Amino acid sequence: MSSEAIKKFLDGFSVEVTPKAASKIENFEDYIPSGTLVYIAHIEGTPIDEMVETAKKINDQGFCAMPHFPARIIKDKNVLEDWISRYKNEANVSNALLIAGGANKPYGEYDSSIQLIESELFDKADFNNLHIAGHPEGSMDIDPDGSTTNVDQALSWKNEFSKRTDANMAITTQFSFDASSVISWANNIKEAGIDIPVHIGIAGPAKLQTLLRYSIECGVGASIKIIQKRAMDLTKLLLPYKPTNIITELATYKSNNPSFNIEKVHFFPLGGIKQVSDFVKEAC
């Protein structure tokens, strides 16, 4: 696989940070290209003040902040409207990732990203980019029976919404380690009529123990087996994981199938943003 194809596949990649991680980064330009899309994870319990402050820092440094809006921790429409207003007016934010969120039960009236969309507040605030979640390996949280029925129905609804909104939409997925399952999922949703572009989630370089912990927490079942198999190989146990194989396989497939619906790579820097930066430089 040529480095040129990998470079093209990684062009325009995005990263994700928490306010805590962002507070330790003095200058984002030391690690990522100017203009990079930076998602801000809104972990349950994080004050909105910290989220807005982080978004402002990212935008002020010449990057594009995209905060998470987890439906289950938003009490009501007034709170949602306040968050949107603060992001817009205090941090110049016009991007959002709309998700259900990881809270076990809703704080108030919202339980899904569809309800956030139905509020129409993002369109009224002229948000330019609205991204939604994708689940290449399904989601036990959404489909406890192990099927993809609810996930598929929600994605179909959001696809119809994408035709009505002025905002640009994309599907940002949970991370995976298995290229074949990602390719199969991406092709399946395209065949089902979903024409929203996909930004595929990729775990950045990290220790195997870290990957296993996050994989279990995020419920990426098929991928856990891949990491466990690697951990059983004593020659690789002490070596940090790098997403070389999955990036190479996806870049190869994209090169051979230009209409493939995966358009961008979204890195989860589980081992740190510097490790992602170093990996991209090496890969390209």
Show which residues each predicted segment covers:
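Active-site pocket-lining/capping segments in soluble small-molecule metabolic enzymes
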Residues: V17-P19, I99, S112-E137, T148, ...
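Glycine- and other small-residue-rich loops at beta-strand/loop junctions that grip anionic moieties
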Residues: V17, I43, R72, I171-F175, ...
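Active-site glycine- and acidic-residue-rich loops that bind
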Residues: K75-N78, N104-S112, T173-W185, L208, ...
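Active-site beta->alpha loop and helix N-cap motifs at the rims of alpha/beta catalytic domains
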Residues: S2-Q153, G272
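Conserved, mostly hydrophobic/aromatic
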Residues: P67, K158, A167, I200, ...
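Short, well-ordered secondary-structure micro-motifs
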Residues: G108-E109, I142-P144, I183-S184, Q209-C218, ...
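C-terminal helical cap(s) of enzyme catalytic domains, especially alpha/beta-barrels
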Residues: I273-C284
